[in-house]
């Protein structure tokens, strides 16, 4: 068992409450809102950090209908998939998934519940807001997020009746239909909602062997129900939510590396179409109890996922059905009171994940490789995060997290008739901390500094590999240093930060695709600057602009990739959009024009597969025809810019996945109330 300590951070987080409580002044107490992001608006963790919050109308205006489209509205975030939607590649501030398909660098939360890694890319249903927190968040969130947190908050049912239907069509015979109804079942006591969604995003890739010409897309069906028991004049409430999502996809579709404008897949003669079906069931029980000084929240959540996946790989046909089960429990307590000198959050967290994989690699005339594997992972954690308001302008924050991680694996199989197998268990302990300080230079201008640690747990490879023992990889750990500022008035919002992140024991996949193994690849350093601003230059009009420059490299003492760039991290990025409202006698018109620039980046640790700089231009025009009817048209990627989203070496040649190109669509929404 190995204990990792960084005493200045951990001890600072432990000692700060005692120091602060010793000097707590006698002040009037009043209610302090604890948001879905687990922070009060006055806490250091809410203010001494780089963050972006996007509302539901902003998501709709930008055409964000799934989590992999969030980079359109969350500056600095990059999301693609490596092969298909099961395996997301995420980077933020130079911290990258780096081909670690089963453990993204940024954790996705939905209503306080961390999602399965294979469910990170999902359609969005009835979203109220999305928040991005940059940098490690392990002393505030139960699941230690190394690079940051994406926190999706959905609309909760209350006494206000809501309901609408949506429908739309777009390029490549794609369409979207949605129904939502929410409101009181018994006003003052019980509330409920239901959401149904059908979302089809077909592709246009061609398999010459089968004649299929719509490959590369997804078709999702989703249902969600919520109940909220919240008696009037009572300090408690309870909630229940259940959802089911089934998605069919044909995304394991590749073209030749230099054929990014082509539509014919790079396949062996006679290869079948790629196919994947993913079904995910989720259930959540939640409770909240409020006293004069504290608010207590309890969440217990379960997710069950199974998927089947078949795709051609060279001369082999691969079948990889997999089952996942995850349950999460979290208890959190937070202080209340606007005038408190000390604000605190304490939490206990448990996560248990179980996985079973069956895989078969078949040659045209005989089986080549088959295996069955079982893996488990469990995390037990306790965390605290607090703020000491030294004056009305100066505060310091600190936090500490203790984690105990356990994992196990057991697998067996045969390769060309030769059996193999092994099993193993491992456990590890981590102590993480964070410290921050912030000062209000004026009523509108704040400067801050922050130091925080993050990690990805130790564990075992999910996919068994013949000839290799069950050897665990160790935890990947990082420390982030940040200096930032935020300025906000009624007309202008500006935030900027410079940061440095050092990561050691990086977890990186290597080897042939389909048979890759995860191991520790050494150390990496990421440095960068980021800026985002919004100017509301006229009533109903705003201009957004953002940019970042990042240098993320493996250090010279990294065993495999010394001096190379970390995969999936663009060297720079930028974006700008103009949004407006034009009042006419026939209803308001809402134009939007947005451009996004993504810098060069690599898809592999060897830095052999490089995607160059590209830019896309999106436009939309909404029309509020009546109080309850909205019609919008949009053109995404107006100039049909084609670029690679993922690539790998297939033998001696490289293949790539490419984006879908220009998409034109029209959507209509009708509100019931």
UniProtKB/Swiss-Prot annotation:
Domain TBDR plug: 41-155
Record key words, sorted: Cell outer membrane, Ion transport, Iron, Iron transport, Membrane, Receptor, Signal, TonB box, Transmembrane, Transmembrane beta strand, Transport
InterPro entries linked to this entry: Plug_dom, TonB-dep_rcpt-like, TonB-dep_rcpt_b-brl, TonB_rcpt_b-brl_sf, TonB_sidphr_rcpt
Keyword DNA-binding attributed: no
Motif TonB box in this chain: 30-37
Signal peptide: 1-22
Membrane topology value: Multi-pass membrane protein
TBDR beta-barrel domain ranges (all copies): 160-672
GO cellular component: cell outer membrane
TonB C-terminal box, short sequence motif: residues: 657-673
Main location: membrane
GO MF assignments: siderophore-iron transmembrane transporter activity; signaling receptor activity
Cellular localization per UniProt: Cell outer membrane
Family according to the record: Belongs to the TonB-dependent receptor family.
Main function: Receptor for the bacteriocin pesticin and for the siderophore yersiniabactin.
The name this protein goes by in its record: Pesticin receptor
Species classification: Bacteria, Pseudomonadati, Pseudomonadota, Gammaproteobacteria, Enterobacterales
